[in-house]
Amino acid sequence: MAFLKLTEQNVQGKTVLIRADMNVPFKDGKISDDTRIRASLASIQYCMDNGASVIVMTHLGRPTEGEFHPEDDVAPVAAHLGGLLGKNVKVLNDWRENKPALNAGDVVMLQNVRINKGEKKNDLELGKAYASLCDVFVNDAFGTAHRAQASTEAVAQAAPVACAGVLMAGELDALGKALKQPARPMVAIVAGSKVSTKLTILESLADKVDQLIVGGGIANTFLLAEGKAIGKSLAEHDLVEESKKIMAKMAAKGGSVPLPTDVVVAKAFTADAEAVVKDIADVAEDDMILDIGPKSAAELADLLKAAGTVVWNGPVGVFEFDQFAGGTKALAEAIAQSKAFSIAGGGDTLAAIAKFGVTDQIGYISTGGGAFLEFLEGKELPAVAALEKRGA
């Protein structure tokens, strides 16, 4: 991937427009998790340290275009950002009528981009309006890279210079390292409740990886494809044939989809359900498979420890309930101990990594969510394509 990077630009005396993803959650009117704001600090600080003035833009929530409601206001985000930077960050509501006059080191924020008409439709005129504010446009919002919108794609076409911020460049470099030129053997973990939501990822990764570990409801569908009984476990019977094709594709290239030989079952999906370890052949009609068993976890852990590259998306069991967390914990710890380059993404995966205290031992943790999944699928990300076009 060829694209310009913010850290390679001379921004002295220039106005830099940064598209960040500061779409943070609120609870009782207060920001409950500022991870996304903190993730954007590196690019903002780089510009401040190098004599630029900074305009930040972000979306917040799901407002109706052309309408402004108090809950859509980015003012709390600007105030929190200001607290982290140690300076006042003013919100600009009328930036189209009154172009801001800024000094080096100033940081301001545009009002919520999603209230602007034409934002979601990637309106070129709106993109030009954003671009008119700056000398350099920086996209640092990997989480929205799979969407072609005026603040991510059209602005990149229109700005004098368009480049990737520190966070965006880090994501793209890590994903490129993991998927374009992976160290072998390459192992992927794809888990979740449904094959249907991850089918294109499974098919895409089956072309790339040496071992494809599946977990959760996805594994149950693959177990059905192998003719195993899964009791009343969550599975998709209509995708058994697709699962067989993926296993055949892996086998044809000398790889495999290693399925559990033992599992942890319960009679109910509840926090206090009794967990019982069983061989897969002993699963009863009224059993629900809620985790992989210790024998399977140990075998998969050995695979991960010997890997050159690991891509992880999804916990292999109901890790929120401690009695069904053993499988995910064993794999998380194996990845942490492995010399492999590891990249992990997806909300549940990040929650599991945090729960088991291995955050600092994962090679790269993607902030992307949907963008991370679409990259795994091999899809072109519009905002990234726009940066590549400008960097050519």
Curated annotation (Swiss-Prot):
UniProt keywords, alphabetically: ATP-binding, Cytoplasm, Glycolysis, Kinase, Nucleotide-binding, Transferase
Family: Belongs to the phosphoglycerate kinase family.
Leading EC class: transferase
Catalytic reaction annotation: (2R)-3-phosphoglycerate + ATP = (2R)-3-phospho-glyceroyl phosphate + ADP
Record-linked InterPro entries: Phosphoglycerate_kinase, Phosphoglycerate_kinase_CS, Phosphoglycerate_kinase_N, Phosphoglycerate_kinase_sf
Pathway: Carbohydrate degradation; glycolysis; pyruvate from D-glyceraldehyde 3-phosphate: step 2/5
Subcellular localization, as worded in the UniProt entry: Cytoplasm
Binding locations of ATP: 198, 320, 346-349
Binding site for substrate: 21-23, 36, 59-62, 114, 147
Protein's recorded name: Phosphoglycerate kinase
Assembly, per entry: Monomer.
Protein's gene: pgk
EC numbers, comma separated: 2.7.2.3
Membrane-spanning intervals of the chain: none
Top-level taxon of origin: Bacteria
Any GO molecular function: ATP binding
